[in-house]
């Protein structure tokens, strides 16, 4: 059975919802799932004052455990068109894994959330994939296999590189049913492709 980690950073809970949906989809695809988050770097008093969602139930991951999985889906909030510093800080601690080639031929996939539709989602998706590529991971994108990302009738998440959601500047917009469905699709797709590669 494929062992998959869904690893995320979420300040306000949007990516937490997407990560849970991706985990559901991966389970449907036959994977054994672990859902974890990266440590918060913002001081607790600042996080509380900024109304961060600090009661997230997922346990905190450690960089060394990434080698234990066949596939890793990273979900991250974005800051100025890049992954959030919390996720970058976590990935910057994986140099030991890189030196050992511990993630070579593992499967990787990425999802992001942004404040606006044009808030750098595609750049954040691709630049997070770069981190995985430096580790020798095999990238499995959302791709246009997920057809529900097409159309302009409503705000829709998704890009060929990975699933996206938009939160609005004040965080008031929650992931839509379509976006959660896309996250489930991506999780299932990663699980099924990983099973073919590692089965």
Curated annotation (Swiss-Prot):
EC assignment: 1.6.5.2
Taxonomic source organism: Brucella suis (strain ATCC 23445 / NCTC 10510)
GO molecular function: flavin adenine dinucleotide binding; FMN binding; NAD binding; NADH:ubiquinone reductase (non-electrogenic) activity; NADP binding; NADPH dehydrogenase (quinone) activity
Listed cofactors: FMN
UniProt similarity note: Belongs to the WrbA family.
Compositional bias segments (type: Polar residues): 163-177
InterPro entries, per the entry: Flavodoxin/NO_synth, Flavoprotein-like_sf, Flavoprotein_WrbA-like, FMN_Rdtase-like_dom, NQO
Database matches in NCBIfam families: flav_wrbA, PRK03767.1
Domain of life per record: Bacteria
Region (Disordered) location: 162-181
UniProt: FMN binding residues: 10-15, 78-80, 113-119, 134
Cofactor stoichiometry and binding remark: Binds 1 FMN per monomer.
GO CC annotation terms, alphabetical: membrane
Record keywords, A-Z: Flavoprotein, FMN, NAD, NADP, Nucleotide-binding, Oxidoreductase
Name used for this protein in its record: NAD(P)H dehydrogenase (quinone)
Residues that hold substrate according to the record: 98
